[in-house]
Each structure stands twice: as structure tokens, then as C-alpha cells.
């Protein structure tokens, strides 16, 4: 039967907003307890930023990566359009070597500008004696390395970035679901959430997004440094 307003208010005060949304508002975000980006994703949906975001050939495409050795590698394809970050495409696979991903990039037929990779690209592969960055270079992929930050700092960078994003609803289905699902586990015994996010199928796409967010933050910092150096050199002329 119908639930009256007083019962709904009482339920909200007992359950908390997320569980209430799940029970009474059919909220998809509400299904994930401890959701890290849930509220931000809801806001993106409300603002129609998760929609058709077609590739604009007049802008180059950039990529941000999470690289796994034996598990998944995830790639986000995005375009910087003014202040906005248009995430137009995504790809994930597992147990594939670098040539596979280089081929995927070729097949997509985008004009690429830069590729941002995680810091572990510089680790040496004992089987080949080369770093994965060197292997990528030989395949025509020149990577910039995102700074090594704590997971929490990376999550903070993502939270700063998401309000600037538009995400393609067709090409980024798994990425969107991963954003919704990404969460911290609840410790019943201590009645609190673990500080680290739960590692599961949603981790790889979210790690690629962290690479993107921290890479862009670093770029901003580098640009400020360059401007400061230029300013100082003018002063000393």
C-alpha cells in the first residue's frame, strides 16, 4: 500500500539518504553502500552530463590508462574542450600484451595528442628487461607519467575533476557502471567503512580515471611553474 509522509520522514531519519533512495525512490546509486562518487554521478545525471558525447574531430583525443600485468588494463579516451573534459570512449581487457592495446588505439582512428599512464609504467618487466614505457614507445605510444599519489589524494583529484566531465552514455557503459559501483566496504564489527576502496571489477576503470585526474592536476602545476619561471626571467632582464 501507499506510505504516508510521516512514515517516509521517519524512514529517512532511520535509514539515511542512500538507503532511503534505494527503498523508496528506486535510486540506482542507493544500491551501493559506501559509494565513493555516488552523489557526484547523480549530479552529472541531473545535469544531463551523462549523455551522447560524440567525438569532435576538430579536437585531438587523449588517453588515460590503468595497466595490469595479469589482470585488467583500462583506457579512457577524452577530449579537452574549453574547460570541459569530454570522456568519449573507454576500453578494458585482460591478459593482453601491449601490442593489443596499441592496435585498439589504431583501430579507433582518432587523432591522438597525449597518453597519460600510471607511475608503474617505469617498472622493469623481468621477462624482457625493459620497462613497459619503453615497450609502448617502440609501438608509437609516448606516455606522460601521472604523479604517484596516495589513493585518497587521487580520489580527491577525481572529485575535483568530475564536475567538469561529460561522459558518453553509449561508449562508456562499463565505465559509468564502475563509477557507480566504486565503494568502501563496511566493517560491521567497528561500525565504520574501510579507508581503502574495495578492490573488484570496478577498480580498473576508476584507477584509469585517477590517472586522468592526477595527470591533469600535475599538468596544471607544471604550467604554473613555467609561467613563474618566465615571470622571474622577465624581472631579471
Regions found by a protein language model. Give the residues of each.
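Short, conserved catalytic/metal-binding motifs centered on acidic residues
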Residues: 24, 66, 75, 179, ...
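Anionic group-transfer/hydrolysis microenvironments
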Residues: 68, 91, 209
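Mg2+-dependent endonuclease catalytic cores in nucleic-acid-processing enzymes, primarily RNase H-like
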Residues: 76-200, 219-226, 230-233
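Glycine-rich phosphate-binding/hydrolytic loop that grips phosphoryl groups
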Residues: 154-158, 206-213
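ATPase catalytic-site recognition across NTP-hydrolyzing enzymes
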Residues: 1-64
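Gly/Thr-rich phosphate-binding beta-strand-loop-beta motif of the actin/hexokinase/Hsp70
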Residues: 56-80
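Short, hydrophobic alpha-helical segments
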Residues: 212-220
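Conserved small/polar residues in nucleotide/adenosyl-binding loops
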Residues: 235-237
